[in-house]
Amino acid sequence: TTLILDILKGYAPVVVTQNYFPEYIQLSALLAFLGHIFPFWLKFKGGKGVATYLGILLALSYSLGFLFMFTWVVVSLIFRYSSLSSMFSSLTVLVITFFRENAVKAINPDFIFAADIKLILFIFFILIIFTHRKNISNLKNRTEQKIKL
C-alpha cells in the first residue's frame, strides 16, 4: 500500500493541475516531488522519491511511466539492486526525453513547455541521485542489499 500511496502522491496533483491549471504542470510536479522527499512534518526527512516520480511520469505520459517501470524491472532482474534500478530508470527517462522530441511531445503535444519539462526531469534525476547517496556508497563498498527474488 505504501508504494501505491507514494505513486498517487505524484499522480493525483499533476492530473488535477493538468485539468484545471495546465500552465502549472511542472510546478505541481516539482512540489509533489519535493514534498515527498522533504516533508516538513518529518523534519524534512522523507522518502527517496522514486514512487512519487513514477506517479508524476504516469500523469505526464504513460509511455514514459511504462518506460521507467520496464527499465526498473529489467535492471532489477539483471543486477538485483532496487537502488541501482531506480537510478538507472531515472537516467533512462531523462536521456530519452532529452534526445527524443517525440517523448516530450507525448508529455505535451503543444510542445509549449518542452524546455521546462526537460529541466524538471533533470532536477528529479539529480534529486533521486541525491536521495540515493548512501545506496551509492553501499554499491561501491559492495554492501548494498540485493532484491530477493
Spans of model-derived segments:
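Membrane-embedded alpha-helical segments of multi-pass transporters/permeases
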Residues: V14-V15, W41, L77, L94, ...
